[in-house]
Regions:
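N-terminal targeting/tethering segments
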Residues: 29-146
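Proteostasis/folding factors centered on peptidyl-prolyl cis-trans isomerases
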Residues: 131, 135-183, 211-215, 235-282
Length: 320
């Protein structure tokens, strides 16, 4: 009888432990484990779900304070990619001798939080400005719920990217071959053929833009895109525009897709002029410099140990 009682007691204890362990396991798997899961790793540096959640909340709070809404459907995936990119930029920049000093970081923070005091308070002393900076910085950190160290890591990565852009931008020539490009977007392939027929019969391109364009801004500018170097254009059209489209002619319609309206439309391009060497505009230079960084990062991904892991289950945890 005593042996049977012991067996019953032991079974009761085991059953009780099982009953207790189920909610404990659920609590651990729901609240303890997910924040520690690594989602980005670049060589020896890693970021986990907890960090991603903190960054997302920061952006949400900033956006809410500015009266804007955040697209939570795409934001986490973009953050994961950006974390990997920013870490590659930081490590790669340091590897080629680029540095961000404490003084540069301090100057950037002061510029950010004292920007509106430059013209309105010229009589303020350095001590006054320091007090104002500290108070504004404190309020900002409280709003986004980050520590000073956490926010300064973000600002440091931004500075590294800017310095890398400057470094790579030094290799971009001041002058490049360019075309004076115009574009006309129309609703259907039939309209595109009408445009081509009328252009062949002598109708000016600007008149065709005014009659057929689906873009009001294009009508205002007569369809002018800009003087552009090759690499500023989308990879799907740049070689065609530069190597095949004759000056003064109009292109075949190029199918495009508008993700906002979920509709297909067609674009016809027109090169009015071409110059073998032309000064690169500031806007085009910025585009080329950004493209240079993108290409550099792509190459760095092949040279470094980079892992990203973010799936639907992790997204569901973030969305809770």
């Amino acid at each position: 009888d005593r042996q049977k009682q012991r067996i019953v007691i032991i079974l009761g204890i085991i059953l009780a432990l099982l009953v207790i362990s189920i909610p404990v396991y659920g609590w651990v798997t729901t609240f303890i484990m997910p924040p520690r899961v690594t989602i980005v790793r670049v060589n020896d540096t890693s970021y986990n779900m907890g960090y991603l959640l903190k960054m997302m909340r920061m952006v949400q709070r900033q956006s809410e304070s500015e009266g804007q809404r955040v697209n939570l459907g795409t934001l986490p995936f973009q953050f994961v990619n950006d974390l990997a990119t920013d870490e590659l930029v930081l490590q790669g920049s340091q590897a080629i001798g680029i540095k961000v000093t404490k003084e540069e970081l301090t100057e950037r923070l002061h510029d950010e939080f004292l920007r509106d005091t430059e013209d309105t308070d010229r009589a303020a002393t350095e001590a006054d400005l320091l007090v104002e900076f500290r108070e504004r910085y404190r309020q900002f950190l409280n709003q986004i719920q980050l520590t000073a160290e956490e926010y300064e890591e973000i600002a440091t990565r931004t500075l590294y990217r800017e310095k890398l852009e400057e470094h790579l931008g030094a290799t971009i020539p001041d002058q490049l071959p360019q075309v004076h490009l115009f574009g006309l977007g129309v609703k259907t392939a039939e309209e595109a053929e009408e445009v081509r027929t009328k252009f062949a019969r002598g109708t000016p391109f600007a008149d065709l833009v005014a009659e057929y364009s689906v873009d009001p801004e294009a009508i205002r500018t007569d369809g002018e895109i800009d003087w552009v170097p090759r690499d500023v254009l989308d990879a799907t059209i740049k070689d065609f525009i530069f190597d095949e489209l004759v000056v003064g002619e109009i292109s075949e319609p190029v199918p495009q897709f508008n993700s906002e309206s979920n509709q297909e439309f067609y674009v016809l391009y027109h090169v009015a002029e071409r110059e073998e060497l032309r000064d690169v505009s500031e806007a085009n230079f910025e585009n080329l410099r950004s493209l240079a960084v993108t290409k550099w990062v792509t190459a760095q991904r092949e040279l470094n140990d980079v892992t990203t892991s973010f799936d639907s289950n992790q997204y569901a945890w973030l969305a809770k």
